[in-house]
Amino acid sequence: MKNLITVSALLLGSQVTAFSQEQPNIVMLFVDDLGWADLGYNNPVFDTPNINKLKSDGLYFSRAYVASATSSPSRASLLTGKESLRCGFVRHIYGKDTSLEFETFDKDPGKMKSRAYLPLEEITYAERLKEFGYYNMFVGKWHLGTEPYFPTKQGFDAMYGTCEHGHPNNYYQPFFKTNNPFPKARKNTYLTNLIGDGAVDFINKYDKKTPFLLNVWYYGVHGPQIGRKDLSLIHISEPTRLGMI
């Protein structure tokens, strides 16, 4: 039997206390650009029964705020337990040149430098959990650097559906202009479903004796705004927004 703890936020600092003798499996769900009013328990317009159940059966942190309301800084802060500025992130990663340690955003009048990747020297919660025997799986969006700084270099044992892009080109094929992690996916397959199916497949096939950490970091609901076709037909009033949730 697989005992799971599902969390939407997990921050481990420099000190990690010992787990109980029976170590739980941990599933981390992280959704991109999702507002607090974009879920059914805060807004009845949205139909999210499974997420609503997670809330009702667990703990709801109503005053847990992201360190920075943009992609890369939030991810760096979540992984390391640090305020994003302490990791050198002022904004999301803009380019793809890993020869640069810092980069500037063209439209920033102050030309404030921000990191182009999460340094390997930073300690992630995946690396801490490995000290307790965890097998760590990463599924989905990374946006903390290109291949030399991918999840498998930051404490994760394997990854699925990960590339260097900060957002897809489309939620249907072709998902990305280059380095598409799903080149053989069927034409009518929705990207968010591929991420979810990959996570479920990992859980169903996991046969190791050690506990696991499963990071499920969705590309959605980041733009481009493209709703799932079948859901968009149901939600005629707002087919794109409701079709993505």
Predicted regions located by residue number:
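Structural cue for short, hydrophobic secondary-structure segments
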Residues: 28-30, 215
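A short, flexible beta-alpha/helix-coil linker loop
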Residues: 33-36, 181-182
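Alpha/beta-hydrolase fold active-site loops
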Residues: 24-26, 211
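Formylglycine-dependent
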Residues: 93-135, 142-232
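Catalytic metal-binding/acid-base residues of hydrolase active sites
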Residues: 34-35, 83-84, 142-143, 219
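Single conserved hydrophobic/aromatic residue that forms the stacking wall/gate
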Residues: 234-245
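Active-site segment of extracytoplasmic enzymes that catalyze sulfate/phosphate-ester chemistry
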Residues: 28, 36-123, 128, 158, ...
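Bacterial Sec-dependent N-terminal signal peptides
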Residues: 1-23
